[in-house]
Amino acid sequence: MSEDSEKEDYSDRTISDEDESDEDMFMKFVSEDLHRCALLTADSFGDPFFPRTTQILLEYQLGRWVPRLREPRDLYGVSSSGPLSPTRWPYHCEVIDEKVQHIDWTPSCPEPVYIPTGLETEPLYPDSKEATVVYLAEDAYKEPCFVYSRVGGNRTPLKQPVDYRDNTLMFEARFESGNLQKVVKVAEYEYQLTVRPDLFTNKHTQWYYFQVTNMRAGIVYRFTIVNFTKPASLYSRGMRPLFYSEKEAKAHHIGWQRIGDQIKYYRNNPGQDGRHYFSLTWTFQFPHNKDTCYFAHCYPYTYTNLQEYLSGINNDPVRSKFCKIRVLCHTLARNMVYILTITTPLKNSDSRKRKAVILTARVHPGETNSSWIMKGFLDYILGNSSDAQLLRDTFVFKVVPMLNPDGVIVGNYRCSLAGRDLNRNYTSLLKESFPSVWYTRNMVHRLMEKREVILYCDLHGHSRKENIFMYGCDGSDRSKTLYLQQRIFPLMLSKNCPDKFSFSACKFNVQKSKEGTGRVVMWKMGIRNSFTMEATFCGSTLGNKRGTHFSTKDLESMGYHFCDSLLDYCDPDRTKYYRCLKELEEMERHITLEKVFEDSDTPVIDITLDVESSSRGSDSSESIDSLTYLLKLTSQKKHLKTKKERNSTIASHQNARGQEVYDRGHLLQRHTQSNSDVKDTRPNEPDDYMVDYFRRQLPNQGLAHCKLRLPGSRHSPASASRVAGTTGTRHHTWLIFVFLVEMGKKIPLKGTDLYGNCFKVTSLQSPMGKQTSTWTEKTRIPTEDLHHNLKSKIKECISFQSKKTGINWTDDEKRSYKDKGIVQTQEILQYLLPIVHSTKNMQTTQIKQLFNPRTNFQIQHQLNPATCRNIKKYSTSWTAPRNHPFVIQGDVMANSSEWVQSKPHRSLESLSPLKGPKKNKHSQIWAIKNEDIKPLSSKWETASSSFGMDANVLKYKSLQAEETNQQSSKHTALHLTKNKDEQANKNDGQPTLYLKFQRES
């Protein structure tokens, strides 16, 4: 054993040396245990010549007591010279002498999930005196809490109410990890089953594992478990029960397999306590007569299986050199919690430079799939492959394969013998009540003082979701570096195992109810990569494994993929690392933009890639059973308000609402007065109005002669009020990307990264307070945080002073301005695209398409090619119900003969202040650039608008816009000319540039 391994032995030596045998714990059983093992400690003698110590054992041989030193079995966990540590049960539990063993077997092809036929029945079993009880376990509630344990538990036999001469099935579950409380025969071949809740609780009924004998082959039996508590289950999504036949195992070497027909998970009648329960029913035909069969929720993995596995490692001369097995602590029932230290032994100081990796499993005893993943990990890391050797040379692995052996032994689903969920008590100071998690946390704390811990992972099972995924932790600081780095390892795992691991199902939020879980506690202790790996009880929905169940080999393979991903994560060649980092940046950019524009009231700092779902089938379930012997919780009395206080509160609320209504009307009136003298600088022209668009704002950008032509009558002074009428009650930001390129070049915009090197992305800011012809240009590098850009896009107006009236706003008016968003400032009119048009002198077909919600909004633009060099990004303030960006779609074509046909899409009707589902409409804008002969003249020609708006001034001077027409049929966009020849003649042979902008929700 290396020097480093000696110093890092975090075993619970304070209690491991005084509990070697059963007689040390309970003196009432000393005589029975002495008769069996014929051992006695020197401390048991009253002779003063014998030293009072527990380290000397007296063995009775040939009529005399022979002293010898106690073997350090507790120190090393398992010993090659002696048997395994005996399994201890609560004293009242009945245990059969028969040892249950199963063979390892993997089906030749993946087992498909069950597809409902629609003919499944829902049996309901009212209480009937004619029903026969065929199995009844001993009452588990003789004591309100755990008292003490002993080897073998209570060996009093339980008589069956039937014999072998009857055709009634015989049930048994009094073995390790077995769970079955009661069985009632309701028909000749139909049985109603009740599973036992976790000991010392009245809930957590999910795990079942029982034996069936005395069956007849070819008979259709129905089994119905009637006391599940979860409304949602994977059985509703095609999961099948597991079945094991001893005759099939001996004859054909077939192990656990998925079986069952007529599978149905449904809500049944309420129980006696008024709670609603859920039933699982299935039918099955046994393959053999008089066979011994088993049914289970998932592949069983018992405490004895773990001890046998660890004993094999300890007896292996090769693996035992780099895998040291110790006892971390003892549980409430005095069962051992093992810890493994896996690393290549080194006697020099280089071993301290190694980083540590921590893995734990089976904190929830019913999640047996976590033990199979742990087994796969240990098989690989202890193997002789070059990658395994590299991992052992690089890291120090601390592994706790079973955190809750007590719960595993008695067949609990979630809790320990304390009646509590251990994965909610990592912050608890009750070492005696939750020893395994207390010592695990202490071990990690001491380990972090000596070396860096790069990863912690707690293995779990999930009862409501398919696939395998992870839960991580996000910081409140929202640092982009840490924010993305915490997602790199799960992303690598999904790439190494694409048919089992789902990155999209991974969640990274830290909720208050999860603060006691292992991953959150370890993350707060300083472990950046702190995860919970969730493995489904069912199967996969990905790749080649889609629609099939996971086998034990599938679960074990996740241990290999975990090691493979760990090598990729720590590879000195950072190619894969940065590739995943770049992919995560793209995911964040797209998903965050979608969430920003879905609800612009949400601050950017609060927008994340995910919202962790409630995982009551995983590490996030609540266990709030109170134990008086653990902690006495004093109930807090709720102090009710007096009638006078309640009336005062109601009156204050009414006054606040009245003041709010008054302030709103007052602000709206002042807003109308302050904008009454706003002058429209756009010129009037006889047949169509031309908007001097961006002329004053961008004189130095080659857009001095950029005009927007809209069909219809002359621009009336009421246009400003009409445009204002289209604004909603929220402030949003519209992003208009104007691409200035050299003519004659074709730039592929589809899939182009706006943050890449092929574009120069800038932001333009205008000085507040006076009109100026210069603009301040700020160039942002692509690696800057995306959140900074998003915050700058949706920031509110920084000036609360009216530009025309010179009136200063009060604090209350500013607050109301922010809350209600009803003020339209002059800056909006400087950048606002005119969207209200007249239908005068238009064809009937054009009018129909004008008011068609599916018609595209087209813009024709002329630019000066002399200044077309850079890409500029302009941000204009817009007040619409939803905030959506313009997304580039298609290619930029410098050929006037190539017309891009518009795709049917939703219109700009979402700009109207409508409520309900109409807020999520889509729209798109086509910008068509025509090059003219004159170098300094350019025009924006706009086709018919895709919708019509009618603004009305209502009572209290509130503005409301109504959509005039909403047709659902699909139309193509109006062309600006009747045919291509006319367009070519109109442009005098000059090339045309098409820009297509699409706004999506």
UniProtKB/Swiss-Prot annotation:
Its EC number is 3.4.17.-. Keywords: Carboxypeptidase, Cytoplasm, Hydrolase, Metal-binding, Metalloprotease, Protease, Zinc. It comes from the Eukaryota. Pfam families: Pepdidase_M14_N, Peptidase_M14. InterPro entries: Cytosolic_carboxypeptidase (IPR050821), Pepdidase_M14_N (IPR040626), Peptidase_M14 (IPR000834). One of its GO terms (cellular component) is cytoplasm. Residues 641-661, 962-1001 are annotated as: Disordered. One of its GO terms (molecular function) is metallocarboxypeptidase activity. The keyword Protease applies. Binds 1 zinc ion per subunit. Residues 299-570 form the Peptidase M14 domain. Its cofactor is Zn(2+). It catalyses: (L-glutamyl)(n+1)-gamma-L-glutamyl-L-glutamyl-[protein] + H2O = (L-glutamyl)(n)-gamma-L-glutamyl-L-glutamyl-[protein] + L-glutamate. CDD domains: M14_AGBL2-3_like. Residues 648-657, 962-971 have a biased composition (Polar residues). Metallocarboxypeptidase that mediates deglutamylation of tubulin and non-tubulin target proteins. Catalyzes the removal of polyglutamate side chains present on the gamma-carboxyl group of glutamate residues within the C-terminal tail of tubulin protein. Specifically cleaves tubulin long-side-chains, while it is not able to remove the branching point glutamate. Also catalyzes the removal of polyglutamate residues from the carboxy-terminus of non-tubulin proteins such as MYLK. May catalyze the hydrolysis of aspartate from the carboxy-terminus of target proteins. This is Cytosolic carboxypeptidase 3. It comes from Homo sapiens (Human).
